[in-house]
């Protein structure tokens, strides 16, 4: 998963990826259920192994699913027998304890996880329907293993993190902090006369210098990246480090406070007036 770091490089993935991988992968605009349906019909549902997506897109900034989009994808997959795979690497245990599938009430057939589930250590995980997981060895014919699979240190850190999230339930507080950041940034951009689209999903944050709407990657590409570069440098000078790409989501952690959120939005208000 190259993520937003290569979003503007004009490459399909990475050198070393066989052409057949790209040839057998069809990319569809996020939030476009009609085109997805047309594409499946054109290819033939029996030729489509799976539909994989981030339930909340976090690799092009932050783009939220339109009302009914995820349910529409779920219905399409259920009707055709195509597997639905949620990439919950970012959203898993972050937007809710049960991830985006809990938050939006949509159950995929398979899910992938990383980041939060590792408790700061490198962990990747996947899971899903019992009949699919039963295909893995030793109960099934699909072999999946690795030298560091089930690494005890990483597993211990991950379990401790997930149990802590379960026991402390920080999600309402993180939701409130995200809303506070959105309100502060909307005020800051309005005062500076800057067109911006600002949103959050729990502790995931997104801002584009774009009047909106921003619901897919084509619209994301219309954001003012030159203004973002000036904003990034201004915020860095103010002592606030942001991801250096306009297409990176931001995140709040349980260590953030209302005071820190307010300091951030106050700094943004000053910087935006200086660089707009």
Task: Identify what each model region corresponds to.
Residues 104-135, 150-157:
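Active-site PLP attachment segment
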Residues 122, 141-164, 197-199:
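PLP-dependent aminotransferase class I/II
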Residues 162-186, 218-225:
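Structural signature of PLP-dependent enzymes
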Residues 1-49:
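PLP-dependent aspartate aminotransferase-fold enzymes
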Residues 63-95:
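Catalytic PLP-binding core of fold-type I/II PLP enzymes
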Residues 166-168, 176, 234-276:
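PLP-dependent enzyme catalytic core of the Aspartate aminotransferase-like
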Residues 153-172, 211-215, 255-258:
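Amphipathic alpha-helix from the class-I
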Residues 179-182, 192-231:
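Conserved PLP-binding catalytic core of the aspartate aminotransferase-like
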């Amino acid at each position: 998963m190259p993520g937003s770091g290569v979003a503007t490089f004009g490459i399909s993935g990475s050198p070393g990826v066989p052409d057949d991988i790209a040839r057998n992968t069809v990319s569809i605009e996020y939030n476009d259920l009609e085109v997805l349906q047309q594409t499946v019909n054109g290819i033939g549902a029996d030729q489509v192994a799976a539909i994989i997506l981030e339930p909340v897109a976090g690799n092009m900034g932050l783009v939220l699913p339109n009302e009914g989009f995820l349910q529409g994808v779920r219905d399409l997959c259920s009707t055709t027998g195509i597997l639905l795979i949620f990439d919950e690497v970012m959203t898993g245990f972050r937007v809710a304890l049960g991830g985006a599938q809990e938050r939006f009430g949509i159950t995929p057939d398979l899910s992938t996880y990383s980041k939060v589930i590792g408790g700061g250590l490198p962990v990747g995980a996947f899971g899903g329907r019992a009949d699919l997981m039963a295909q893995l060895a030793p109960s099934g014919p699909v072999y999946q293993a690795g030298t560091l699979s089930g690494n005890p240190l990483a597993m211990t850190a991950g379990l401790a993190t997930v149990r802590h999230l379960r026991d402390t339930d920080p999600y309402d507080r993180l939701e409130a902090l995200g809303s506070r950041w959105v309100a502060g940034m909307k005020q800051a951009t309005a005062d500076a006369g800057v067109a911006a689209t600002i949103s959050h999903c729990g502790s995931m944050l997104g801002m584009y210098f774009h009047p909106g709407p921003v619901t897919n990657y084509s619209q994301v590409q219309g954001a003012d990246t030159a203004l973002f570069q000036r904003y990034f440098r201004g915020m860095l000078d103010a002592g606030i480090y942001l991801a250096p790409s306009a297409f990176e989501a931001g995140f709040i952690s349980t260590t953030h406070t209302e005071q820190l959120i307010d300091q951030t939005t106050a700094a943004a208000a000053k910087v935006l007036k200086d660089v707009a």
